[in-house]
Regions:
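Short cysteine/histidine-rich zinc-coordinating motifs and their immediately flanking basic loops
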Residues: 51-57
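Detector for the c-type heme attachment site
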Residues: 43-49, 61-62
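C-terminal segment of classical bacterial N-terminal signal peptides
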Residues: 7-8, 15-23
Length: 130
């Protein structure tokens, strides 16, 4: 029984130190800015300039559903989490499932980024927006 514990413990430590499976890793903000062009139909990178969706300036580290001046939140209104790499990665993978999993009403965002590298790059870019 003890022999089986050490490999499992080693695997758990390795996954933890590697950042876990939830986030693909460090992205390239320059590439992310290019991928973000797909997002610009609905989102702005300028503070306070909202479109169909909220401005994404300052989104990293901000409590979800709280972009100042944006009033159209559905699924993220009243959220109790703050955007970090893992949550942004999960959200961008499938926004509708993300909000449903958290018991929210839904989201009008149907766009998703299917490629891990693109999500990592966009997240790296979002981190540069203040």
């Amino acid at each position: 029984m003890v022999k089986g514990i050490f490999p499992a413990l080693g695997l758990a430590i390795a996954v933890t130190l590697a950042g876990g499976p939830a986030f693909a890793g460090a992205g390239d903000p320059v590439k992310g800015e290019k991928v973000f062009k797909k997002c610009k139909a609905c989102h702005s990178a300028k503070p306070g300039k909202h479109k169909v969706g909220p401005s994404l300036a300052g989104v990293f580290g901000r409590k979800a559903g709280t972009a100042e001046g944006y009033k159209k939140y559905r699924g993220l209104k009243g959220a109790d989490y703050t955007w970090d790499e893992a949550l942004l990665d999960e959200y961008l993978t499938n926004p509708k499932n993300f909000v449903k999993k958290r018991g929210a009403k839904g989201t009008s965002m149907g766009f998703r980024l299917k490629k891990d590298a693109q999500r990592a790059d966009v997240i790296a870019y979002l981190k540069t927006l203040k």
